A protein has these predicted regions:
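Eukaryotic intrinsically disordered, low-complexity segments enriched for acidic and Ser/Thr/Pro residues
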Residues: 1-114, 175, 203, 207-209, ...
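Structural register within alpha-helical repeat arrays
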Residues: 117, 124, 131, 189, ...
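Amphipathic alpha-helical interface segments within eukaryotic helical scaffold
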Residues: 121-122, 128-152, 157-228
């Protein structure tokens, strides 16, 4: 492959989600006249979680659909049960922590579906990067899949960066730090642009296009390198990550110069062609030195060296053009095809909600508020009716007593009697 960097997965811990969910749903939704039993669905949900969190470590494309389904189920369930009442202690370990010699690891436990969702999203993006890294550069469909997954991963890390602190409301593990997530999003985007460069070369696109794509790739790796070298982050990464990024930044600058030299060659601008090839050779050597990989971009370096020898020979015998300084030549244009793909829902292709019959919590709360208000109105009206009934009863008793009194004193009484 193109020596892509893949993000390590967060390590989960097994938890009992069956009993807490069963108790919560029964207490919230089940009544004496309408008992609710979701035991089967809850057991399936538990199996789905176990399958998703452990299948991710197999790092196959088929594992993506499994973890997508679990994420979709989490999103759906979060709308149907009160988040503050979920008492499931989800524990996740930091993805970049190697542990000490005593076996200790950085971890965080939070009883929150939102936290579980954040960790699953991190692992989705990490798995996408791993699957992308296994794709072949010789196959067009593989290149398309790699570009798609890397852009989606960039979107997920970007989404996590902006939402994680609000979701968990406490200090996260280092892998979920917003600065870390921003750096990972930048890395995924740079690698996606790299895939577009490789596809353009594979498709034999015009030299000018490849040069512009490579120039943009160099810019993205340069920005990525700045983030990875921050003091609060650089201790997180594997030993060769920063070196690889620095090497690719120089390497894609070199490739941009190489392909721009081919444009100069086709336009018979031999002096500039030689300048760009000389610059490309220096950059290829810098890429190999920075990365610590002597073979990095070696095939391109060999092509550039052959072209440089031929160009110098032609210039010495035919053109005799002046060789300009690399700083004086026109800047190479840029073309960015890699984009951050926003997180969508659902992620899985055929998502089926296990709890489709559960009323969303907002609807349940609205219905509860409706029932409460209805009872208040009904009780108020009944109270008014009782008061009116008591008044009429007292009035009727008064009339009866007056009639009795009048009959005993030979007086005539009528409620409608008008005195003269």
């Amino acid at each position: 492959m193109a020596d892509l960097l893949s993000v390590p997965l967060k390590k989960p811990s097994e938890v009992d989600i069956v009993n807490p969910l069963k108790n919560l749903i029964q207490s919230r939704y089940s009544t004496a006249d309408q008992p609710e039993d979701y035991s089967e669905q809850i057991n399936e949900f538990s199996k789905l979680r176990n399958n998703a969190i452990w299948r991710a470590f197999e790092k196959y494309e088929s594992s993506l659909e499994v973890i997508y389904s679990y994420y979709d189920q989490l999103v759906s369930l979060e709308t149907k049960v009160p988040a503050q009442e979920v008492q499931i202690p989800f524990k996740w370990k930091d993805a970049f922590d190697k542990g000490s010699i005593f076996g200790g690891r950085i971890s965080l436990t939070i009883s929150s579906l939102a936290y579980e969702k954040m960790c699953i999203l991190f692992n989705i993006a990490a798995l996408q990067s791993s699957v992308a890294a296994t794709q072949s550069v010789e196959n067009d469909e593989s290149l398309k899949l790699a570009a798609k997954l890397l852009q989606q991963a960039a979107g997920i890390f970007s989404h996590l960066k902006s939402t994680v602190m609000l979701s968990i409301q406490q200090d996260p593990t280092p892998d979920l730090n917003p600065d870390t997530l921003g750096a990972l999003s930048a890395l995924m985007l740079a690698q996606a642009q790299e895939i577009f460069v490789l596809k353009a070369i594979h498709d034999e696109m015009k030299d000018q296009i490849v040069a512009k794509l490579s120039s943009q790739c160099e810019d993205l790796y340069s920005e990525c390198l700045k983030m990875f070298q921050r003091e609060n982050l650089k201790q997180l990464w594997d030993r060769d990550w920063i070196a690889t990024i620095a090497g690719k930044q120089a390497g894609y600058h070199a490739i941009a110069e190489y392909y721009q030299s081919l444009v100069c060659k086709s336009n018979k601008i031999i002096g500039e062609q030689i300048t760009r090839l000389e610059s490309a050779m220096e950059l290829f050597k810098a890429a190999q030195t920075r990365s610590g990989k002597a073979a990095m971009f070696q095939d391109f370096a060999n092509k550039a060296q052959r072209n440089l020898n031929e160009a110098k020979k032609d210039n010495d015998f035919i053109y005799h053009e002046r060789i300009p300084d690399i700083k004086s030549v026109a800047a190479i244009g840029k073309a960015q095809l890699a984009k951050i793909v926003p997180l969508g829902y659902p992620l899985s292709q055929n998502f089926q909600d296990l709890f489709s019959e559960l009323v969303p919590v907002v609807v349940h709360q609205a219905m509860a508020a409706y029932e409460l208000r209805k009872n208040e109105i009904q009780n108020g009206e009944i109270s008014k009716l009782r008061d009116s009934t008591q008044f009429l009863n007292r009035y009727a008793l008064l009339v009866y007593n007056l009639n009795e009194y009048c009959s005993q004193t030979n007086l005539i009484f009528s409620p409608n009697y008008n005195a003269p």
